[in-house]
Amino acid sequence: MKFHSASEDATSLVLTNYPDVVSIAKSGDLSADAWLIGSGSPSLKVIPSAAYIVLDSTAMTLASTHSFQQNHAIVITPHEGEARSLGFPINDPSERLPVALSMARSLNVYVILKGPATIIAAPNGLHSIDTHGIPELSTAGTGDVLAGLTASMLASWQPRSANEIVETLGYAVAAHGCAAAIAREKRNPITATDVLEALPLVFTEK
């Protein structure tokens, strides 16, 4: 895994806790199978090249302000409030699916619209709906776990077609929801770290 932050303090904190992570600030190597771009990134002057780019939090504005290469699969992960900020308001639960599809088509991105029933939508209209999520996933930081899981699964599975990409995103969302449910069995309320630490159990359960 490679990591970059404009903050030296943040970089130091990450490297102290995760010594296997490579700091781009030190290596200068921007090559990767997938990139996750998060908070504080709209000011980026150079967007790293990768087959898959996941935009989370304030970086989702890049979906409408940056011209990505056509062969890139761009994924955004908004909740309803963020969808509204991007210009796609949802005024009623019945509007979630049509708005997700409109967002995907208009921005030419894959959308993971988070919520009670998370919607995965592709630019060509393909979509799926996941119901594994639980209310506790509204806890701060759990969306970051989903974004990281999504990027890592895209990098690992290397889906090519729209159908394969939607399927991969669906697996990420389902695993995230199942991990939260496992974490809740141990304690409640749960934290984002609880969800992260429960993920290995999801992938080892039969």
Show which residues each predicted segment covers.
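Glycine-rich phosphate/pyrophosphate-binding beta-alpha loops
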Residues: I134-L137
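Alpha-helical scaffold segments in soluble metabolic enzymes
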Residues: L13, S49, S85, S102, ...
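Short, charged, surface-exposed loops that flank catalytic or proteolytic processing sites
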Residues: I90-P98, Q158-G170, R187-I190
